[in-house]
Amino acid sequence: MERTYVMVKPDGVQRNLIGNIVSRFEQKGYTLAAAKLVTLSKETAETHYSEHRERPFFGELVSFITSGPVFAMVWEGEGVIKAARQLIGATNPSEAAPGTIRGDLAVNVGMNVVHGSDSPESAEREIAIFFKEEELNDYQKDSNKWV
């Protein structure tokens, strides 16, 4: 089963948006395999966002993502990586479609509420940064036959 990493960023946690975001994934029939509230260390943040290391906004990004707790999640289901990206919406909220998480909830590109893996490779790498294998739950929901 395909898995993806989704993280509610500090602005989303502070604005009490965790439940709203979780509900959107549940309503699409995806299964929550793992979740935890954690405040990232600078080292973990730099590892997570390593592909942006040479970008001018890297320092601000690391500072923001370590400014408070994040809600780290692993979702699973068929096509969940692509579906999560569609649910999340464009990085810049002003370009995100209404009905997407960022289109409905994000304030600006710097505080865009949520992160989601953009590929199977990213999902695997990001899940491994935040979760040990034994923290990932593998179960079948009875409701799966209905969605």
Curated annotation (Swiss-Prot):
SUPFAM superfamilies: Nucleoside diphosphate kinase, NDK (SSF54919). GO terms for cellular component: cytoplasm. GO terms for molecular function: ATP binding; metal ion binding; nucleoside diphosphate kinase activity. The keyword ATP-binding applies. CDD domains: NDPk_I (cd04413). It comes from Shouchella clausii (strain KSM-K16). Keywords: ATP-binding, Cytoplasm, Kinase, Magnesium, Metal-binding, Nucleotide metabolism, Nucleotide-binding, Phosphoprotein, Transferase. This is Nucleoside diphosphate kinase. Its EC number is 2.7.4.6. Pfam families: NDK. The active site is at residue 115.
